[in-house]
């Protein structure tokens, strides 16, 4: 399978998955080659309007971090990137994912945040507001690829690999209850809701990510 010009991993039973860039402006071309026969499919990508969200009153060092923490942020971003880039053969990406916690959706995917009047990168997950200490479930079975207590932006953070480049990220946790390499079943408790990192209140920032993005 080739999506646009990118080869995408296919499972033994014929499943594949890829993600679309938030701001993609053109259709997707999928090329399937089987036993020497090539088929080409075109899928339409619809334009979407995103919410603009303004948040004021944040500590200035969380909006524009001081130069003294640039190295830390860069190192943490590299570790996150490595965990998100894992493209294993785990089969759990095909499962029906569940919500990791019950609560109010206070931030939506794709929204543009303006923090203290300064436009920032778009939001690539959803914020689920819940009481501090609320138990968080794994939304699907998988293997823990990152478990950190105190990242600069996302605080307590867990990343889980579900196979074929699909990962889930759980951020702003009060407590992290798993370790790298742990094999987790869907619904297992992995941590608790907190307000760590750059957060305006107790919530879970929940992100589903695809390593194969076009």
Which residues fall in each region the model found?
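Zn2+-dependent peptidoglycan hydrolase active-site motif and core
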Residues: 139-177, 202-204
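Short polar/acidic secondary-structure junctions
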Residues: 21-22, 35, 133, 149-151, ...
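Cationic-aromatic interfacial patches
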Residues: 1-42
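Surface-exposed, glycine-biased beta-strand/turn segments
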Residues: 42-154
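Short, well-structured beta-strand-loop connectors
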Residues: 135-146, 178-193
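Extended, charge-rich intrinsically disordered regulatory tails
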Residues: 188-195, 200, 208
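Conserved small/polar residues in nucleotide/adenosyl-binding loops
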Residues: 206-214
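Terminal peptide-recognition signature
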Residues: 30, 105, 142, 187, ...
């Amino acid at each position: 399978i080739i999506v646009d010009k990118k080869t995408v991993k296919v499972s033994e039973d014929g499943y594949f998955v890829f993600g679309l860039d938030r701001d993609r402006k053109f259709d997707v071309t999928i090329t399937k080659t089987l036993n020497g026969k090539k088929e080409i499919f075109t899928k339409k990508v619809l334009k979407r309007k995103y919410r603009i969200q303004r948040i004021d009153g944040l500590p200035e060092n969380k909006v524009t971090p001081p130069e003294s923490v640039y190295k830390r942020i860069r190192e943490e971003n590299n570790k996150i990137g490595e965990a998100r880039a894992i493209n294993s053969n785990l089969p759990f990406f095909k499962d029906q994912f569940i919500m990791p916690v019950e609560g109010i959706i206070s931030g939506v995917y794709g929204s543009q945040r303006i923090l203290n009047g300064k436009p920032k990168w778009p939001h690539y997950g959803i914020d689920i507001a819940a009481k501090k200490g609320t138990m968080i479930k794994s939304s699907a079975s998988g293997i823990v690829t990152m478990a950190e207590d105190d990242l600069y932006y996302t605080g307590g953070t867990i990343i889980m690999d579900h196979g074929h480049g699909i990962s889930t990220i759980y951020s702003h946790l009060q407590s992290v209850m798993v370790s790298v390499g742990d094999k987790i079943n869907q619904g297992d408790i992995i941590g608790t809701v907190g307000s760590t990192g750059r957060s305006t209140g107790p919530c879970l920032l929940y992100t589903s990510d695809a390593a194969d993005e076009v």
